[in-house]
A protein has these predicted regions:
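N-terminal intrinsically disordered, cationic/polar leader segments
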Residues: 1-31, 41, 45-110
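Short, conserved glycine- and acidic-residue-centered signature motifs
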Residues: 32, 36
Length: 110
């Protein structure tokens, strides 16, 4: 199972942790894993490459995990954009959980 934990401070989503394999299918044929990976890469690329922010990203292949943390202080436009991206990602993963409850878990942690 893949566990996705969204981190927040108050109402601000500060980042997320994704860990584990979904186990839906074998590597290369796992549509749940592909959906998760695609969303994570889209958000990370948008935050760091398009918006030019310096979000901290850590990848550990040993336990199939990736984490992203937003910088502490962002301008109003960047903050609003990042919150919209992360909220959309949270909703998307909740919908995936509804479709594949045995393969993805979504948590929120303050």
């Amino acid at each position: 199972m893949t566990t996705i934990t969204f981190r927040s401070q108050g109402s601000r989503i500060t980042g997320f942790d994704v860990q584990g394999h979904s186990g839906y299918a074998e590597a290369g044929a796992d549509i749940v894993c592909a959906a998760i990976t695609s969303a994570v890469r889209l958000v990370e690329t948008t935050v760091n490459d398009v918006l030019g922010l310096a979000a901290s990203v850590k990848v550990r292949e040993s336990d199939a995990s990736i984490s992203l943390r937003l910088p502490g202080s962002l301008g109003q436009t960047a903050e609003s954009t990042c919150q919209a991206l992360l909220t959309g990602m949270m909703i998307y993963f909740a919908q995936l959980h509804d479709e594949y409850p045995e393969h993805i878990e979504v948590l929120e942690d303050e």
